[in-house]
A protein has these predicted regions:
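Cysteine-nucleophile active-site neighborhood
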Residues: 65-136
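Short, well-ordered coil/turn elements that cap or connect secondary structure elements
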Residues: 3, 33-35, 93, 146, ...
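N-terminal beta1-alpha1 cap of cysteine-dependent amidohydrolase-like domains
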Residues: 1-88, 211-214, 220, 225-276
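Flexible, glycine-rich phosphate/dinucleotide-binding loops
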Residues: 17, 47, 67, 107, ...
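Hydrophobic/aromatic beta-strand patches that form the interior of the parallel beta-sheet core
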Residues: 9, 39-41, 59, 99, ...
Length: 276
């Protein structure tokens, strides 16, 4: 590892549970392996967090359980870590970039006081439409994606009831919402937030690929639960969505790569200016 290397910290929030998210994230990072190196930190099981000054880019994963609960140790240290990154960005020219996914996204929304987090009436799991907001139409995270686009959704909790005064105060923006459901009266959940120029988060799983989705369906209990919720026809439709190159493949190849390219370019550009 040289001084010129871009260092990425993956904050593993899965609490030791088997998952496909880590494999998918590492696969995407490896597409940039000529520029970056990474290390995994087991946040919830071992309370591992990186030193702020040692890494440049942070990806905080999805994970199981209630995002409003922790053990009073790892969760408080995690929130303090987020604050330390924010403080760093206020005081230093070379910025730290962070992506929050699913469980981490919900925790970040809570920490920043932007919205309510509550339990859904039923689990959301599958290939879902995601709609860009007006702000999302021009957000660089989504460059190359249509509107709406498709993503893998897997959540028991949701982010709703945005506190718009807090969004304005912090300069945060809602950049996508869940699918439009004309047949129900429930509020559309927030699917992504631009917390700042350097922090962004998604409720859905931008790392997911068809392999990860199929791996989840190998769990008989989960597969039967999805069929019970959606019916066999919609279940078959979801399987067809997996093979559509303009759906999950497109999202996997776009969002995290965009995040990494933006972060890497910003860091290298600033380093070059400072070295002159």
């Amino acid at each position: 590892m040289t001084d010129a290397t871009i260092r990425i910290a993956i904050l593993d929030m899965y609490n030791g549970e088997p998952n496909q998210g880590m494999r998918c994230i590492i696969d995407i990072i490896n597409r940039f392996n000529h520029l970056v190196e990474f290390k995994v930190f087991d946040v919830r099981r071992h309370c591992e967090l990186p030193e702020v000054n040692k890494y440049d880019i942070y990806i905080s994963t999805g994970g199981p359980g209630n995002p409003l609960e922790g053990d009073g140790n790892w969760d408080l240290k995690y929130y303090a870590f987020i604050d330390a990154l924010s403080q760093w960005n206020q005081e230093n020219a070379v910025k730290k970039h962070m992506l929050f996914i699913c469980h981490s996204f919900q925790m970040a929304c809570k920490h920043f006081g932007l919205a309510e987090i509550n339990k859904r009436r039923q689990t959301s799991f599958g290939v879902m439409k995601v709609h860009k907001t007006e702000e999302g139409l021009t957000d660089p995270l989504y460059d190359g994606l249509p509107d709406p686009f498709y993503a893998v959704d897997s959540r028991d909790y949701q982010v709703v009831q945005p506190k718009l005064s807090m969004f304005r105060k912090k300069g945060a923006k809602i950049i996508s919402l869940e699918k439009i459901r004309d047949h129900v009266q429930y509020e559309r959940a927030i699917m992504a937030v631009r917390f700042s120029e350097y922090f962004v988060g998604t409720q859905f799983h931008p790392e997911a690929d068809p392999i990860s989705y199929i791996a989840n369906l190998k769990n008989k209990e989960r597969r039967e639960k999805i069929i019970e919720m959606k019916g066999k026809i919609k279940f078959r439709d979801m399987l067809e969505d997996l093979l559509d190159e303009d759906k999950i493949y497109k999202t996997n190849e776009t969002i995290i790569p965009n995040f990494l390219r933006i972060a890497i370019n910003d860091i290298l550009k600033t380093r070059k200016i400072l070295s002159n």
